[in-house]
Amino acid sequence: MGRGVGLQSAKGSSTSGYVQRSLAHDNRDDKTGIVRLKNKNYELRKITKRSQKVDKPANESKDNGLKKVLVEHDKRREIEVQVSELRDSLEDKQDRNPDEWPDKRIDEECEKLRSTLLADLQEKEKYQKAYTPRSKRSSESSK
């Protein structure tokens, strides 16, 4: 072990020889409450890691484009799920009564539903672009 800490050899000690940091020892000064840096390099690395973690949300704009693409994909996927559910139900009706539900009519019904759902989605997106939530406005004004 380095720096004279721990066992020189774990052999015969019935332990692994691993030495843990003592959680009971506090590096705070009793009067001021400030942490004293005994192992300066380690403490400084720890502090810089914390500050880097805090800075990450500011770089969120890089991921914003990806998030928009994923959200749009999920919405379109939900539309396709609804269309496929309609197709399944119409095909079940076709099995019971083939003359009433030919394949062409099923395709037309599915396309009609898809077009109405896509139109609704585009209308919602138009309104979302016109309105910006207060939380976004306050973060943009602080920049």
UniProtKB/Swiss-Prot annotation:
Residues 72-129 form a coiled coil. Pfam families: cwf21. The keyword Transcription does not apply. Residues 10-19 have a biased composition (Polar residues). Residues 23-33, 40-74 have a biased composition (Basic and acidic residues). Residues 1-74, 87-107, 123-143 are annotated as: Disordered. GO terms for cellular component: cytoplasm; Prp19 complex; U2-type spliceosomal complex. It is found in: Cytoplasm; Nucleus. Keywords: Coiled coil, Cytoplasm, mRNA processing, mRNA splicing, Nucleus, Spliceosome. Residues 71-120 form the CWF21 domain. It comes from the Eukaryota. The keyword Nucleus applies. GO terms for biological process: mRNA splicing, via spliceosome. PANTHER family: SERINE/ARGININE REPETITIVE MATRIX 2, SERINE_ARGININE REPETITIVE MATRIX 2. Involved in pre-mRNA splicing. May function at or prior to the first catalytic step of splicing at the catalytic center of the spliceosome. May do so by stabilizing the catalytic center or the position of the RNA substrate. Associates with the NTC complex (or PRP19-associated complex). The NTC complex associates with the spliceosome after the release of the U1 and U4 snRNAs and forms the CWC spliceosome subcomplex reminiscent of a late-stage spliceosome. Belongs to the CWC21 family. This is Pre-mRNA-splicing factor CWC21. It comes from Candida glabrata (strain ATCC 2001 / BCRC 20586 / JCM 3761 / NBRC 0622 / NRRL Y-65 / CBS 138).
